[in-house]
Structures are given as structure tokens and as C-alpha cells.
Amino acid sequence: MTKPIPKIGSRRNSRISSRKSGCRTPIGVIHVQASFNNTIVTVTDPQGRVVSWSSAGTCGFKGTRRGTPFAAQTAAGNAIRAVVDQGMQRAEVMIKGPGLGRDAALRAIRRSGILLNFVRDVTPMPHNGCRPPKKRRV
């Protein structure tokens, strides 16, 4: 008489596991956000779904060392190693922020063997928007 209720949880779990394992993206987008305190590297597919990510903090750097170029290089290497294993060959790079890790992260990306279509600077620049914070007096 009554229809059986499908188990949503089991279907959802199988869908997530199949997405994680069978993820082959030959082209992707690498987002590098370099602030003065940290560098975050996120690798997405062309639709914007995150495939891999890493930051200087997750690589074991704490405190002021997270903002260093070496920490950014390590974070970029960790994020890209995972997607190269999944078969990514080409990528576009979007760099955002004024941090020290911009060039180091780009150097690590170039050394990884991924062919870069283009490198774009997407740092947000205000057209005289909000008032900046006051200058520090030390």
C-alpha cells in the first residue's frame, strides 16, 4: 500500500565517495591568496568546485613564519601535488593579495610541471571606497 521511503543517507554517502575517487580534471584554476600573515592556495576545476587546497598554517608554519615566501612555496607544492596525481596538466593562475608569498607560490607552481594558460592578478583595488586603518605608531 505505502511506498517504501528511500534511504537518503546511504545514497548521499555513495555519491560523495564516488566524486572524491573518480575526480579527473585535466584543466583547473589555481587561486593564490597571499596576505601579509598567511598564504592560501586553492585548486578548483573550471566550474569552481574545490579539488585541493593548502595553506601555510596547515603545512606546519605558525605565527609570523606563515607569511614568509618559503611557507607559501611549501603550501603551493602541497596543494598541487595532489592534483598532479589526479591527472591535471593545464591550469590558470589567479593571484590575489599583497603578501610576500605571491612570487614564491608562482615559482612553485611553475616548477610543478603544470602548463599555465595565463597568470592573472585579481587583487581587489578600491576606487576610493572605505577609509583605511590608521597608520601604526611604534
Curated annotation (Swiss-Prot):
Q: NCBIfam families attached here? A: PRK05309.1, uS11_bact
Its subcellular locations are:
Plastid, Chloroplast
Question: Keyword rRNA-binding: yes or no?
Answer: yes
List, in alphabetical order, the GO biological process terms annotated in this UniProt record.
Answer: translation
Q: Which family does it belong to?
A: Belongs to the universal ribosomal protein uS11 family.
Show the disulfide pairing: none
What are the boundaries of the region Disordered?
1-22
UniProt keyword Chloroplast, yes or no: yes
- One example GO MF annotation: rRNA binding
Q: How is this protein annotated for GO cellular component?
A: chloroplast; ribonucleoprotein complex; ribosome
Per the annotation, which location comes first and is thus the protein's main one? plastid
Q: Which Pfam families match?
A: Ribosomal_S11 (PF00411)
| InterPro entries, alphabetized | Ribosomal_uS11 (IPR001971), Ribosomal_uS11_bac-type (IPR019981), Ribosomal_uS11_CS (IPR018102), Ribosomal_uS11_sf (IPR036967)
The name under which this protein is listed is: Small ribosomal subunit protein uS11c
SUPFAM superfamilies assigned to the protein according to its UniProt record, in alphabetical order: Translational machinery components (SSF53137)
Q: Which UniProt keywords apply?
A: Chloroplast, Plastid, Ribonucleoprotein, Ribosomal protein, RNA-binding, rRNA-binding
Subunit structure, as described in the record: Part of the 30S ribosomal subunit.
Q: Which residue intervals are annotated with compositional bias (Basic residues) in the record?
A: 9-22
